[in-house]
């Protein structure tokens, strides 16, 4: 059986749909594929094929998100650099390892911000014949590299804290430590507000946060708690100078918080790199939705994965009756999916119900 590929936009969004048409459909007049049943008048067919370059939304959707992400990361980088220098100077003068630990984490954040900006630039590059999906996953690689930086620096700081516990021959200027750590708390709160992305609504189609900005936000949120713990230890040392061991103890606590902040990122990104179903989507719910479309008899070879956090891809094989208008089925599937989920790319292969083989292992549903 010979197949013909058709490409068009779904609901005028940056979503491509690829459908494979069998020989039995060749003589049928194609229907408008940009229009859901009950919508307004049909557009000119132009060969019944609509491409992404016919829509300004399609080309501008991704770039608009990139601009917002870059603005947030640039603003966060500037603030992070200024307060990092202030903490290095203040921590050195105060003799506080906890403050220097906080400065080191700001250095980690600054590095991660710069890596994220670089990865965003890479992800905006056009696809090539070797990288046909483009450079979207450069964002994920940049975020994972920043997590690795956290682990390395945290290990060094824990080692220094152990030395202070074993050899407590050091002095701390608690007054300077309070001033510097208080400013650090304020700076990290500002960073968190800049990087925070509000999500309006709770359905699957709400846009997910950019991967790089999300990783940076988690870093900044962890630093808020870390800076607060440094401030608390500074107050303890100020009122009880004999309790100066609170400084290395605070370093241990901050290190644990920093490592804990990376666990969720690693979990989500590992699933993404393993081509798992994106967070917020359910395999069963997508299949059930497809089976509700008129003309759909069965669904198999359903695959859902992501290029990056906000670039979801779906491909599926759908069986229909021989008398069913496959173009109408495709239109129904496109409308159902695009109204419920935010998809970057959609591929549908229409097959005849008579060609289905119940014993085919590839057509079986995956395990739970």
From Swiss-Prot:
Name the membrane topology term: Multi-pass membrane protein
Expression induction per the record is: Down-regulated by IL1B and IFNG.
**Tissue and organ distribution:** Expressed in endocrine pancreatic islet alpha and beta cells. May be more abundant in beta cells than in alpha cells. Expressed in cubical epithelium lining thyroid follicles (at protein level). In the adrenal gland, detected in the cortex, but not in the medulla (at protein level).
Q: Which residues bind Zn(2+) 1?
A: 105, 109, 219, 223
Motif: HCH Motif; annotated at 51-53
> What GO terms fall under cellular component here?
cytoplasmic vesicle; plasma membrane; secretory granule; secretory granule membrane; transport vesicle membrane
| Assigned keywords, A-Z | Antiport, Cell membrane, Cytoplasmic vesicle, Ion transport, Membrane, Metal-binding, Transmembrane, Transmembrane helix, Transport, Zinc, Zinc transport
Molecular-function GO terms, alphabetical: metal ion binding; protein homodimerization activity; zinc ion transmembrane transporter activity; zinc:proton antiporter activity
Task: Mention any additional remark.
Answer: Each subunit of the homodimer independently transports zinc ions in a pH-dependent manner. The cytosolic pH promotes binding of zinc ions to the transporter binding site. Upon change into the organelle-facing conformation, the two histidines of the zinc-binding site get protonated at lumenal lower pH, triggering zinc release into the organelle. The transporter then moves back to the cytosolic-facing conformation where the two histidines get deprotonated at higher pH, resulting in a net antiport of 2 protons.
Its job: Proton-coupled zinc ion antiporter mediating the entry of zinc into the lumen of pancreatic beta cell secretory granules, thereby regulating insulin secretion.
What does the similarity note say?
A: Belongs to the cation diffusion facilitator (CDF) transporter (TC 2.A.4) family. SLC30A subfamily.
- The name this protein carries in UniProt is Proton-coupled zinc antiporter SLC30A8
Q: Which organism is it from?
A: Rattus norvegicus
């Amino acid at each position: 059986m010979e197949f013909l590929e058709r490409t068009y936009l779904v609901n005028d969004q940056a979503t491509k749909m690829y459908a494979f048409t069998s020989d039995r459909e060749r003589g049928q007049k194609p229907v408008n594929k940009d229009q859901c049943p009950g919508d307004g008048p049909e557009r000119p067919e132009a060969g019944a094929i609509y491409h992404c370059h016919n829509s300004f939304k399609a080309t501008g959707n991704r770039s608009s998100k990139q601009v917002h992400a870059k603005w947030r990361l640039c603003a966060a980088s500037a603030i992070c650099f200024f307060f990092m220098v202030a903490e290095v100077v203040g921590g050195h003068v105060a003799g506080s390892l906890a403050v220097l630990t906080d400065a080191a984490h700001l250095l980690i954040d600054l590095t991660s911000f710069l890596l994220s900006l670089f990865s965003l630039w890479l992800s905006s590059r056009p696809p090539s014949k070797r990288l046909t999906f483009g450079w979207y996953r450069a964002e994920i690689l940049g975020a994972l590299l920043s997590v690795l930086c956290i682990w390395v620096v945290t290990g060094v700081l824990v080692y220094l804290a152990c030395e202070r516990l074993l050899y407590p021959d050091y002095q701390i200027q608690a007054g300077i430590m309070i001033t510097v750590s208080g400013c650090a708390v304020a700076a990290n709160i500002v960073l968190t507000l800049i990087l925070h992305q509000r999500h309006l609504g709770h359905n699957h189609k709400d846009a997910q946060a950019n991967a790089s900005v999300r990783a940076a936000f988690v870093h900044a949120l962890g630093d808020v708690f870390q800076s607060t713990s440094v401030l608390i230890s500074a107050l303890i040392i100020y009122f009880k100078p004999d309790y100066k061991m609170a400084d290395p103890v605070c370093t241990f606590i901050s290190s644990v918080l920093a490592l804990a902040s990376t666990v969720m990122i690693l979990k989500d990104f590992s699933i993404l790199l393993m081509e798992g179903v994106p967070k917020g989507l359910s395999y069963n719910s997508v299949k059930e939705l497809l089976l509700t479309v008129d003309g759909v008899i069965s669904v198999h070879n359903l695959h859902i994965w992501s290029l990056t956090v906000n670039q979801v891809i779906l491909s599926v094989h759908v069986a229909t009756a021989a008398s069913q208008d496959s173009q109408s089925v495709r239109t129904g599937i496109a409308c159902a999916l695009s109204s419920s989920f935010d998809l970057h790319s959609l591929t549908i292969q229409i097959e005849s119900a008579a060609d289905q083989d119940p014993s085919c292992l590839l057509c079986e549903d995956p395990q739970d």
